[in-house]
Amino acid sequence: MAALIARSGLKALNIRQTRQQRMATVPRAAVEFYGPDRAKFLGPFSENDTPEYLTGEFPGDYGWDTAGLSADPQTFARYREIELIHARWALLGALGILTPELLSQYAGVQFGEPVWFKAGAQIFADGGLNYLGNESLIHAQSIIATLAVQVVLMGLAEAYRANGGSEGFLDDLDTLYPGGPFDPLGLADDPDTFAELKVKEIKNGRLAMFSCLGFFVQAIVTGKGPVQNLTDHLADPTVNKAFASATKFTPGV
């Protein structure tokens, strides 16, 4: 009898250990960022509840959709694609806006014009706009021609992507997260790491989209780049602040 009890106890212990081992192997990202137990942000008018169609299957789903924009699965899929593409463009744009101004102010790197909107405005100057400051690369003098080329080249690339590319070209890759040759560093090889990186990408992409909007507004209101605006604010926060700039702003002046 004692031996039977000992064997039963050992079996129960093994079952508990096996269950704990299985729980330990559940990816952290799967619990923290996905599924019903994920972190949620229930914003205004959410009635403290998550819509049933937001199951936590996709990265960046925090359970808030007051307007019901994601209720239709096809619309949801389209919005996911649009958001991710714009997020990636915003990440690149924010980097391109900040880097030249930072390098110019704090590293002494010489640019023809480090402020992002002033650099683009050089196309209206008599000398035109030289890409990367080098006239031998692209010397643009017509805004209409530049826009036309941009629309044609980017339109063709976007149409090619939206239509799934050519037949047989990278058919086995995901359209939003292709990986493979597009991940030469192998950052997405580990499933748990990949799941977490997708969440980080969309979170930072959303921040970048808001940042770019802020950069545009700053450029219109203050006529300065974001780095200079931050420098001015830190030097005198009571004078150089958003409220003061907004109250002094006159469109067209």
Swiss-Prot record:
<dbReference type="InterPro" id="IPR001344">
    <property type="entry name" value="Chloro_AB-bd_pln"/>
</dbReference>
<comment type="similarity">
    <text>Belongs to the light-harvesting chlorophyll a/b-binding (LHC) protein family.</text>
</comment>
<dbReference type="GO" id="GO:0009523">
    <property type="term" value="C:photosystem II"/>
</dbReference>
<dbReference type="GO" id="GO:0016168">
    <property type="term" value="F:chlorophyll binding"/>
</dbReference>
<feature type="binding site">
    <location>
        <position position="132"/>
    </location>
    <ligand>
        <name>chlorophyll a 3</name>
    </ligand>
</feature>
<keyword id="KW-0597">Phosphoprotein</keyword>
<dbReference type="InterPro" id="IPR022796">
    <property type="entry name" value="Chloroa_b-bind"/>
</dbReference>
<feature type="binding site" description="axial binding residue">
    <location>
        <position position="41"/>
    </location>
    <ligand>
        <name>chlorophyll b 1</name>
    </ligand>
</feature>
<feature type="binding site">
    <location>
        <position position="200"/>
    </location>
    <ligand>
        <name>chlorophyll a 5</name>
    </ligand>
</feature>
<feature type="binding site" description="axial binding residue">
    <location>
        <position position="201"/>
    </location>
    <ligand>
        <name>chlorophyll a 3</name>
    </ligand>
</feature>
<keyword id="KW-0157">Chromophore</keyword>
<feature type="binding site">
    <location>
        <position position="249"/>
    </location>
    <ligand>
        <name>chlorophyll b 5</name>
    </ligand>
</feature>
<feature type="binding site">
    <location>
        <position position="64"/>
    </location>
    <ligand>
        <name>chlorophyll a 1</name>
    </ligand>
</feature>
<feature type="binding site" description="axial binding residue">
    <location>
        <position position="233"/>
    </location>
    <ligand>
        <name>chlorophyll a 6</name>
    </ligand>
</feature>
<feature type="binding site" description="axial binding residue">
    <location>
        <position position="138"/>
    </location>
    <ligand>
        <name>chlorophyll b 2</name>
    </ligand>
</feature>
<dbReference type="GO" id="GO:0009765">
    <property type="term" value="P:photosynthesis, light harvesting"/>
</dbReference>
<feature type="binding site" description="axial binding residue">
    <location>
        <position position="86"/>
    </location>
    <ligand>
        <name>chlorophyll a 2</name>
    </ligand>
</feature>
<feature type="binding site" description="axial binding residue">
    <location>
        <position position="204"/>
    </location>
    <ligand>
        <name>chlorophyll a 4</name>
    </ligand>
</feature>
<feature type="transmembrane region" description="Helical">
    <location>
        <begin position="207"/>
        <end position="227"/>
    </location>
</feature>
<feature type="binding site">
    <location>
        <position position="150"/>
    </location>
    <ligand>
        <name>chlorophyll b 4</name>
    </ligand>
</feature>
<keyword id="KW-0934">Plastid</keyword>
<feature type="binding site" description="axial binding residue">
    <location>
        <position position="158"/>
    </location>
    <ligand>
        <name>chlorophyll b 3</name>
    </ligand>
</feature>
<keyword id="KW-0812">Transmembrane</keyword>
<keyword id="KW-0472">Membrane</keyword>
<feature type="transmembrane region" description="Helical">
    <location>
        <begin position="89"/>
        <end position="109"/>
    </location>
</feature>
<keyword id="KW-0603">Photosystem I</keyword>
<keyword id="KW-0479">Metal-binding</keyword>
<dbReference type="GO" id="GO:0009522">
    <property type="term" value="C:photosystem I"/>
</dbReference>
<feature type="transmembrane region" description="Helical">
    <location>
        <begin position="137"/>
        <end position="157"/>
    </location>
</feature>
<comment type="subunit">
    <text>The LHC complex consists of chlorophyll a-b binding proteins.</text>
</comment>
<keyword id="KW-0602">Photosynthesis</keyword>
<protein>
    <recommendedName>
        <fullName>Chlorophyll a-b binding protein of LHCII type I, chloroplastic</fullName>
    </recommendedName>
</protein>
<feature type="binding site" description="axial binding residue">
    <location>
        <position position="83"/>
    </location>
    <ligand>
        <name>chlorophyll a 1</name>
    </ligand>
</feature>
<feature type="binding site" description="axial binding residue">
    <location>
        <position position="218"/>
    </location>
    <ligand>
        <name>chlorophyll a 5</name>
    </ligand>
</feature>
<feature type="binding site">
    <location>
        <position position="242"/>
    </location>
    <ligand>
        <name>chlorophyll a 6</name>
    </ligand>
</feature>
<keyword id="KW-0148">Chlorophyll</keyword>
<keyword id="KW-1133">Transmembrane helix</keyword>
<feature type="binding site">
    <location>
        <position position="161"/>
    </location>
    <ligand>
        <name>chlorophyll b 4</name>
    </ligand>
</feature>
<keyword id="KW-0150">Chloroplast</keyword>
<dbReference type="Pfam" id="PF00504">
    <property type="entry name" value="Chloroa_b-bind"/>
</dbReference>
<feature type="binding site">
    <location>
        <position position="150"/>
    </location>
    <ligand>
        <name>chlorophyll b 5</name>
    </ligand>
</feature>
<dbReference type="GO" id="GO:0009535">
    <property type="term" value="C:chloroplast thylakoid membrane"/>
</dbReference>
